[in-house]
């Protein structure tokens, strides 16, 4: 990995390879997984990837799906978008701002460490 990279976010990644992880701050922000053999493997890969990071944080966007990680649900009418698009988008944007604020700018973030009542769509799986 390029040494200029100081922190990364994987927004609802497809497949991650644990051996590609680095000892830098990593946030894996994901939609809920359906239970299947593939997703059980995917959870193992994501967990190992996060374990190798320093720190490795995993969060789930409750009620969302892959489309909710961008702004398309806000500007286009998608039939397959679940949940409150604005609330989900606000949660994603805030988490990204807080994560990079903490790990690139040194601004402490309670949201990243503990979550927040005003962001009920965010579930912290592993903490820093």
Q: Where on the chain are the PLM-derived regions?
A:
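Primarily recognizes the serine-hydrolase "nucleophile elbow" in alpha/beta-hydrolase
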Residues: 1-22
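Short flexible/disordered coil segments
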Residues: 7, 39, 43-49, 118-128
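Active-site-adjacent alpha-helix of alpha/beta-hydrolase-fold enzymes
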Residues: 24, 29-89
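Arginine residue identity/basic-tract feature
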Residues: 4-6, 17, 40-42, 51-52, ...
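Alpha/beta-hydrolase-fold serine-hydrolase catalytic core, especially in secreted/extracellular enzymes
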Residues: 3, 63-128
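Generic structural signal for short, flexible, solvent-exposed coil/loop and linker residues
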Residues: 17, 47-50, 101, 111-113
């Amino acid at each position: 990995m390029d040494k200029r990279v100081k922190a990364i976010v994987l927004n609802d990644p497809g497949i991650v390879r644990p051996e590609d992880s680095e000892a830098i701050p990593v946030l894996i922000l994901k939609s809920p997984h359906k239970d299947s053999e593939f997703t059980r493997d995917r959870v193992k890969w994501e967990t190992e990837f996060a374990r190798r990071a320093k720190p490795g944080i995993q969060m789930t966007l409750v009620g969302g799906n892959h489309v909710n990680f961008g702004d398309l649900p806000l500007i286009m009418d998608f039939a397959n978008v679940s949940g409150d698009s604005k609330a989900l988008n606000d949660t994603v944007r805030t988490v990204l701002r807080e994560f990079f604020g903490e790990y690139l700018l040194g601004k402490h973030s309670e949201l990243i460490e503990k979550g927040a009542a005003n962001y009920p769509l965010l579930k912290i799986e592993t903490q820093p």
